Curated annotation (Swiss-Prot):
Documented EC number(s): 6.2.1.12
Protein name: 4-coumarate--CoA ligase-like 7
Cofactor requirement: Mg(2+)
Native organism: Oryza sativa subsp. japonica (Rice)
BP GO annotations: phenylpropanoid metabolic process
């Protein structure tokens, strides 16, 4: 039977793929979501609070949602929406009048997840300050590098992380101090003091500086405007469940771009965000699962390692309806295991980046059935697939570098004109550096990072493709594929493999089973058995650490 033909709409776009022959780009198949005019002054908090659904328990339209805005997953302490707004307003005023923050000031945040962190984010954003969150587990040297990159003048930390901050910061505020508690309860202007002028924040102004992962190169600081978060949250708002309370377990770190977004989104949608504090996180995946059960959450954000680990936990999670997963690829065998273990849960894969925001995601049960894809292109987003050698745009079904254009894209890297020049083209397209393709049904597939392609003779071998094959082998727990220098071939693919406990799997068996499933030039040429694969909190393989590991290994036979 012939494949169904792709129809075109009035604009000449394929109704199946979104490909437009005139522009040689793919547009989202989803209905466009209206956004505020870009020249209208509007901070993200203003936009978020305007979206809040009103309580159905009263005829008064002024009442906020009756459910809590935030719940501590460990203690059960809750913050109502009324209390949340009151704290945000009090803190915003105190940050201006008592701390001296002004619009454009960069605030470095080095604090573990807690109920005060979302309040701090919203307060900073509402006065036009720039939020720059970082991983509290970083070393002092790493923290110093990020503070320097962002140009932060003030830092918010806790007692245990403040010692990592470099000297030279104008102000350091500890979230676990009486001083900060007094800022949260600030009652306004002191008697006789001149009132502060009203803050006007434009959508084009920087809201956050977030750091690229640095898994494959030096860390860079991406500046994201208020409009970026307005656009992303508007898309989620258009799909929100009407007239019901939604409880979401925030399984992504608050400093991570995904966790940061979902903190903002949860408030804007009137959902209850169950915050995973250190007390829960220390218990690992078991702690997350127990929190999901205890609070009967319907939604959950999770990285691939968490999704993998959930299949090994003894739990049912009857209330759970959806998991949003992103940050790194999830092998098809792992997805199949999850679906068998939790058939009532939609595992919604998504794809995005710190620099581009959300690029694609799954939004329905039908879309979740397209295993291996990252969903369809997000509303209001336009992408191109470009041959990375010739620069020629490609149609559906062909692999090339993914370029993105849309309202959620970053303004640029802070203080790095060289990186900006290579990342953006003259028409505003952001080059992701990811090798992708869009299939005949409009689903986006991420093949690999272009920088990570292994140059074997005249061929390019995607490590992620080989990693998926390795993950499909029953005796392998985890795996990574790396290039290794070779005199004749240039580079050869080397697999680092974590075996199942007690497995007697051999190097020859691994190489044989992979060779049966790939083209000859993609074959694994060497296998090293290791105890673990180093990964970031989001599940990305830390390839730089593996490079060091390979250097230490004896590879004289290659």
């Amino acid at each position: 039977m012939a494949a169904p033909t792709s129809m075109a709409n009035a604009d000449g776009e394929s109704t199946r793929t979104g490909y437009c022959a005139a522009t040689k780009s793919f547009r989202s198949l989803r209905p466009p979501v209206p956004l505020p005019p870009p020249d209208v002054p509007l901070s993200f908090p203003e936009f978020a609070f305007s979206l809040l659904p009103r309580s159905s328990s009263s005829s008064s339209s002024s009442l906020l949602p009756a459910n809590p805005a935030l719940v501590d997953a460990a203690t059960g302490e809750a913050v109502s929406f009324q209390a949340f707004l009151s704290r945000v307003r009090a803190l915003a005023g105190a940050l201006r009048s008592r701390v001296g923050l002004r619009g454009g000031d960069v605030a470095f945040v080095l604090a573990p997840a807690g109920l005060d962190v979302p309040v701090l984010y919203f307060a900073l954003l509402s006065i036009g300050a720039v939020v720059s969150p970082a991983n509290p587990a970083l070393t002092p040297a790493e923290v110093s590098r990020l503070v320097s990159l962002s140009g932060a003048s003030v830092a918010f930390a806790v007692s245990s992380t403040a010692t990592k901050l470099p000297a030279g910061l104008t102000t350091v505020v500890l979230l676990d101090s009486p001083h900060f508690r007094s800022l949260l309860m600030d009652c306004g202007q002191a008697q006789g003091q001149e009132p502060l002028p009203v803050v006007v924040v434009r959508q084009s102004e920087t809201a956050a500086i977030q750091y690229s992962s640095g898994t494959t190169g030096r860390v860079k600081a991406a500046a994201l405007p208020h409009r970026s978060f307005i656009a992303m949250v508007a898309g989620f708002h258009a799909l929100r469940a009407k007239a019901r309370e939604v409880r979401t377990l925030l399984g992504a770190p608050m400093f991570h771009s995904m966790g940061f977004l979902f903190v903002l989104q949860g408030v804007a949608l009137g959902a209850t965000t169950v915050v995973v504090t250190d007390a829960v996180a220390r218990a690992g995946i078991r702690g997350l699962v127990e929190a999901a059960e205890r609070w009967a959450v319907m939604d959950m954000t999770a990285s691939p390692p968490v999704v993998l680990g959930m299949t090994k936990q003894r739990c049912r999670l009857p209330a759970l309806e959806r998991i949003t997963c992103g940050g790194a690829p999830l092998p098809a065998p792992a997805i199949e295991r999850f679906r068998r273990r939790f058939p009532h849960v939609d595992l919604c894969m998504g794809y995005g980046s710190t620099e581009a925001g959300g690029i694609s995601r799954m939004i329905s049960q039908e879309e979740c059935n397209h295993i291996g894809s990252a969903g369809r292109v997000t509303e209001n987003v336009e992408v191109k697939i470009v041959d990375h050698v010739t620069g020629k745009p490609l149609p559906a079904g062909q692999q090339g570098e993914l370029w993105v254009r849309g309202p959620a894209v970053m303004t640029g890297y802070v203080g790095d004109n060289e990186a900006n020049a290579t990342t953006f083209n003259s028409e505003g397209w952001l080059k992701t550096g990811d090798l992708c393709y869009i299939d005949q049904d409009g689903f986006l597939f991420v093949v690999d990072r272009l920088k990570e392609l292994i140059k074997y003779k005249a061929y390019q071998v995607p490590p992620a493709e080989l990693e998926l094959v390795l993950h499909s082998l029953p005796q392998i727990v985890d795996a990574a594929v790396m290039p290794y220098p070779h005199e004749e071939a240039g580079q050869i693919p080397v697999a680092l493999v974590v075996k199942q406990p007690g497995s007697k799997l051999t190097e020859a068996e691994v190489m044989y089973n992979v060779a049966k499933q790939v083209a000859p030039y993609k074959k694994i040429r060497k296998v090293l058995f290791v105890d673990s694969i180093p990964k970031s909190p989001s599940g990305k393989i830390l390839r730089r650490e593996l490079v060091n590991h390979l250097r230490l290994c004896e590879l004289s036979r290659l």
